[in-house]
A protein has these predicted regions:
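C-terminal motif of bacterial Sec signal peptides marking the signal peptidase cleavage site
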Residues: 24-27
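Solvent-exposed loop/turn segments at secondary-structure junctions
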Residues: 67-69, 98-101, 118-120, 130-134, ...
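A non-catalytic alpha/beta surface segment that caps or lines the substrate-entry region
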Residues: 56-119
Length: 340
């Protein structure tokens, strides 16, 4: 009886040991899979984003003046953006067309597509708009409503971050996937607040609408997209925009985790934001590429939930913060270099 009990105990010990080993292998397998899928959780990766460089790129765009549609400043800045991307080894495709504004105005438009390793797959899409709003229609002074916006934040900042990422990609030349940077035109020619009619609802993001319906390459696809809108403002914090969560919630999770890993969780808050009509909508609904919008939310700002300078004459370099540029740029780099 004693031997039988001892044998039974020994068998039980072996059974439990084998079960433990099996569970350990399963756990390791799951951990390995989780690490692969959510590798942004592990540690900072990729080159250091240079906020001073991004700030300079922002300034250089503003030096042309407001880049409003059909203006000389717009045309000159277009050439500068193309040349800057080319100088960093990007293959550039200018997608030119004539769009129609809400008021019937023909708008000479150029979407600028700059590709890192254009023949490589998979691809990631990073985008921003580069035009300036023609009217400061949210300015507290009504006398400024028909003046153009310099668009240091609402335009130049997103392009500046993309240019600095492109420069960093060329410098390290180790990213094992392709990246397409798209500068969308005619985003900010939307229906002004001082108009008395009814906004038809599709007057914004005209360049993105055109690109989504007329892809720069037949059959173009990307694993996902990230839109950078107003990513240089003072006091900016980025909430999780609701339509981004609807169309690409897994990408929202990925980007916000990446921000936490690189130390910018105080900029990327785990809070729900409102839904925004922006360039990411046609990318999602027409091009069928899951795309999120990194856009600030100021819940306590009386002037606008987009911040105090939005669509005002004060959207200038005096209100650009290198810390915000750094937080966004380093987060996007973390996302890119975490991909497998």
């Amino acid at each position: 009886m004693e031997m039988t009990q001892r044998n039974s105990i020994s068998k039980c010990i072996w059974v439990y040991y084998l079960l433990f080993i099996g569970l350990l292998f399963v756990s390791c397998g799951n951990l390995r899979k989780q690490t692969s899928d959510n590798s942004v959780l592990m540690q900072p990766v990729g080159p250091v984003f240079n906020a001073d460089s991004a700030y300079l790129f922002c300034q250089q765009q503003c030096d042309f003046g407001p880049r409003t549609m059909n203006s000389q400043a717009h045309d000159a800045c277009e050439q500068w953006i193309v040349q800057k991307f080319q100088s960093y080894g990007m293959t550039v495709i200018p997608q030119k067309t004539v769009l129609t504004g809400y008021d019937g105005m023909p708008l000479r438009s150029t979407n600028i597509i700059a590709s890192y390793k254009p023949d490589l797959t998979p691809r990631i899409l990073i985008c921003a708009h580069w035009d300036s709003r023609p009217w400061a229609d949210n300015d507290p002074d009504e006398a400024n409503w028909h003046k153009p916006v310099m668009a240091a934040n609402d335009g130049a900042s997103g392009v500046a971050v993309m240019l600095e990422i492109a420069r960093a990609l060329q410098a390290v030349d180790s990213l094992a996937l392709g990246v397409d940077f798209i500068c969308f035109d005619a985003e900010d020619y939307g229906y002004p607040q001082w108009e008395t009619g009814i906004d038809p609802g599709n007057t914004w993001a005209l360049g993105a609408q055109y690109w989504a319906a007329n892809l720069h390459k037949p059959g173009y696809n990307a694993r996902y997209g990230i839109l950078l809108d107003m990513v240089g403002g003072q006091g900016a914090q980025f909430y999780q925009e609701s339509q981004s969560k609807q169309y690409a919630g897994h990408i929202v999770d990925k980007v916000w985790r990446a921000a936490s890993v690189v130390g910018y969780g105080s900029f990327f808050l785990m809070k729900d934001g409102v839904g925004i009509t922006d360039d990411h909508i046609p990318v999602n609904t027409v091009a069928k590429i899951p795309c999120i919008d990194i856009i600030p939310h100021y819940p306590f700002c009386e002037q606008s939930s987009f911040g105090p300078t939005w669509h005002t004459v004060n959207d200038d370099m005096a209100h650009i913060d290198k810390n915000t540029l750094q937080a966004v740029g380093q987060t996007v780099i973390q996302v890119l270099f975490s991909e497998r």
